[in-house]
């Protein structure tokens, strides 16, 4: 199966020109205004005290710029960024090897920090609190503990599931930042900036057309820009206008809401096969031809967020927005009361 253009997870195309598109300083970073304001204050305060920035947790959906913010923090603090992930650190020794390579004001960025092994976490606690690393050399009766001093560094954890962090780890993270989806206007600014870096001419209308299909996510916006740029170079004299963006994205099967073929197939299944629902998730997955976990983790969250489906105790139901989007008429007069539905009922 080909890679999905509108997934917020990282795919192969994202590595192309990825770092050239990322801002280096906090005043270049577009969006997340509340997060930027707080971080800017904390960074300046740490600099004035000549201390390391307190440890940070960035949480929210994927693709919103957590790694970019970590890189900006490292640049602002005059340190280097070292990147790893929770699943990649399998043993305490793996983490110890990383910690001993850090220098003063370096930033250690751990993606998916909620997936850290608990034994690995225990190594982190004294490193975060006291900047020391306790290691045991030898085995059995001959073993001994050695304490190594570490430079003043900043740990930045990123997670899509803040509730899965252990309490001891969460208590040691002094700066909590919630990342939110971007507005279409903010994404338009990001797209215009990225187009300039890529050497592609784009109109404001063309940028907005891509922005509104980018699902509130900069990673998707930049990905769609790269693909639309290909069409512009071949078919539209290297200029992305509103019309060029529309036609290109139609060929890429990304509609005006940012839905792709499977998103629309889910809505069609609920409306056409089950009269708008309710329908159980297992049955829905069967009709769509996707794995149940894929429906729940990949496709459903955005449809819920946009208000095109709701979860009820009896299953998924399509809303009036879904009917309108597909050009269908609701023959069932019953209305969905969203207040009686919950995003967390299965």
Swiss-Prot record:
Keywords: ATP-binding, Cytoplasm, DNA damage, DNA recombination, DNA repair, DNA-binding, Hydrolase, Nucleotide-binding
Subcellular localization(s) per the UniProt record: Cytoplasm
Name of the gene this protein is made from: ruvB
Catalytic activity: ATP + H2O = ADP + phosphate + H(+)
This protein's name: Holliday junction branch migration complex subunit RuvB
Location of region: Large ATPase domain (RuvB-L): 1-182
Entry GO MF terms: ATP binding; ATP hydrolysis activity; four-way junction DNA binding; four-way junction helicase activity
Residue ranges, annotated region (Head domain (RuvB-H)): 256-346
KW Nucleotide-binding (keyword) present: yes
Subunit structure, interactors included: Homohexamer. Forms an RuvA(8)-RuvB(12)-Holliday junction (HJ) complex. HJ DNA is sandwiched between 2 RuvA tetramers; dsDNA enters through RuvA and exits via RuvB. An RuvB hexamer assembles on each DNA strand where it exits the tetramer. Each RuvB hexamer is contacted by two RuvA subunits (via domain III) on 2 adjacent RuvB subunits; this complex drives branch migration. In the full resolvosome a probable DNA-RuvA(4)-RuvB(12)-RuvC(2) complex forms which resolves the HJ.
Domains (record comment): Has 3 domains, the large (RuvB-L) and small ATPase (RuvB-S) domains and the C-terminal head (RuvB-H) domain. The head domain binds DNA, while the ATPase domains jointly bind ATP, ADP or are empty depending on the state of the subunit in the translocation cycle. During a single DNA translocation step the structure of each domain remains the same, but their relative positions change.
Signal sequence interval, chain numbering: none
One cellular component term from this protein's GO annotations in UniProt: cytoplasm
Positions of ATP binding: 21-22, 63, 66-68, 129-131, 172, 182, 219
Primary location recorded for the protein, binned into one broad class: cytoplasm
Region (Small ATPAse domain (RuvB-S)): 183-253
